[in-house]
Amino acid sequence: MKEIEILVEVFDEPSKIIERLDEFEFKGIKETTDVYYYDPKRDTLKPNKNMQIDECLRIRTKNNDHYITYKVDKFDEDGKWLYSDEYETKFEDIFMLNNIINKLGLKELLTIQNSKRTYVNDKYEIVLETVKDLGYFLEVEYCTNEDVDVKEVKKEIQKFIDSLELNVSEELNMGKPEMMIRKNNIVIED
């Protein structure tokens, strides 16, 4: 699945944001905990010297359900993030999965806790995220299995965000893991 999304920080009060988003179909609120892992022996599976993650392994717990995800980020010629290829499956036994991760030699990189308030319209999933220790974010995502012009899709997403008339940042071009790495100055020694 190709996920094409734009992530922006939101500076308005949550009540104003929610009031604006309530015109879309509300899908619910989910509390999530994401634990990211790195491999000390694989350069592609740990932050690079620019504190950027090209590939990551994530364990997500969402309302007592557990998912394992491997993400591969795709960048343009200037190093700007375009989209992620994501491979995800649900699993039942978190304790067994943690044993497998430990046996593989993977190490915990960071944990992100957030509350996701999700809406949908006919094209996008729109998520207001309250991220512990980071703030409020709006993620607008278009998912497809088809070959599409990523830059054109992102232009359309940006137009949609602009139409919301919220006080937001420019596109962040990094995910919450990278923001957390930078905020906490996490460095993985070789």
Predicted regions and their residues:
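An amphipathic alpha-helical core segment
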Residues: 125-133, 143-145
